[in-house]
């Protein structure tokens, strides 16, 4: 039985980790970490865990935690994991970090976009970017996993097959993304109050969103070219879900059938990436509560541009589900263990 600890278990991503791991036959959660609810019953914070989780919330003492568990999930704001991780910790436990601390390989880029100083840059190179569909073999032997961001996961998986095939101009990519309000976290903010978001949709972080360099870096690796994108996220009045519609110029003449064959080949063996039938657009309602990503592609022959689409649950494949997928690989378990729950509808 794998013993797990969660730092940040009372945030939305942390609570989703708890929900998934409670149904995982090979895992026991030993530590429910929370800075805000120390010594309070976890089930008093999340009533859905009543009579399911008897544990009390603890602090974020990583040194103590690593003496009690095999794997630590850090579902915390940027800067915390990098301030806690050490060689001593990594010699004892596996770390799966859901923050951005170890996703971006260039420390100057991280500090510029996130506006904080990185506390442990010596571990950046070692950290493995935890997108299982691309880095599966590297993940299996890692000590430190950088769990990808929600927007980057959906954006990358929507674009990846054509980027890898060298069929799109990597400096022409435009990513239009929309997310439910849980993506903004559980902290109290006026901008996220019901009356502020209901019956409205807005763009935010225009030309400045912190996920931009992460998407660019991963697309650059995939294509072997420098990727420079326009990324514009939007907040929509729903709890969960991300919808990505991305556009790019083609560099070769191809048919839609040829584009579809590239996607089919890229994802035919991927359990959690569902390439939809021709003419079917991804929808967030068909992936809610699941670890699935639905993708599709459409050729605009008139403009010679390609439209790449994706939908997923930002809290599952965009955070907790992907973290569990990484954990399964780290411990030699079937990658799908604990993650085959079908999407919830309605």
Regions found by a protein language model. Name each.
Residues 127, 227, 291-293:
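Short beta-strand or tight-loop elements
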Residues 1-199, 204-206, 298-301, 342-346:
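N-terminal Rossmann-like NAD(P) cofactor-binding subdomain of oxidoreductases
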Residues 208-239, 243-245:
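Oxyanion-binding "anion nests"
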Residues 29, 170-175, 226-230, 272-277, ...:
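A short coil-to-beta-strand element that immediately follows conserved catalytic motifs
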């Amino acid at each position: 039985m794998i013993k797990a600890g969660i730092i940040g278990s009372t945030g939305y991503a942390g609570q989703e980790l708890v929900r998934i791991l409670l149904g995982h036959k090979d895992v026991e959660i030993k530590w429910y970490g929370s800075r805000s609810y120390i010594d309070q019953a976890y089930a008093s914070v999340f009533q859905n865990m009543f009579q399911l989780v008897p544990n009390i919330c603890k602090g974020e003492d990583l040194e103590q935690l690593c003496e009690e568990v095999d794997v630590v999930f850090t579902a915390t704001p940027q800067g915390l994991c990098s301030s806690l991780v050490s060689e001593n910790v990594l010699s004892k436990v596996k770390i799966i970090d859901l923050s951005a601390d170890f996703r971006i390989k260039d420390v100057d880029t991280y500090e510029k976009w996130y506006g904080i100083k990185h506390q442990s840059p010596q571990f950046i190179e070692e950290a493995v970017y935890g997108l299982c569909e691309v880095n599966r073999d590297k993940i299996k032997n890692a000590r430190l996993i950088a769990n990808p961001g929600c927007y980057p996961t959906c954006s990358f998986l929507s674009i990846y097959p054509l980027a890898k095939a060298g069929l799109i101009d990597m400096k022409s990519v435009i990513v239009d993304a929309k997310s439910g309000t849980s993506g903004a976290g559980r902290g109290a903010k006026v901008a996220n109050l019901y009356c502020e978001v209901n019956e409205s949709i807005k763009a935010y972080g225009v030309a400045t969103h912190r996920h931009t360099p992460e998407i660019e870096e991963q697309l650059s690796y995939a294509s072997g070219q420098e990727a420079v994108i326009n990324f514009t996220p939007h907040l929509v009045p729903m709890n969960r879900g991300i919808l990505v519609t991305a556009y790019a110029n083609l560099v070769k003449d191809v048919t839609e059938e040829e584009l579809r064959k590239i996607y089919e080949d890229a994802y035919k063996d991927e359990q959690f990436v569902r390439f939809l039938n021709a003419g079917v657009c991804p929808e967030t309602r068909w992936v809610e509560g699941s670890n699935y990503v639905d993708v599709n592609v459409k050729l605009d022959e008139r403009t010679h541009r390609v439209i790449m689409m994706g939908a997923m649950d930002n809290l599952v494949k965009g955070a907790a589900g992907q973290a569990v997928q990484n954990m399964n690989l780290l411990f030699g378990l079937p990658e799908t263990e604990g993650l085959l729950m079908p999407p919830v509808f309605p």
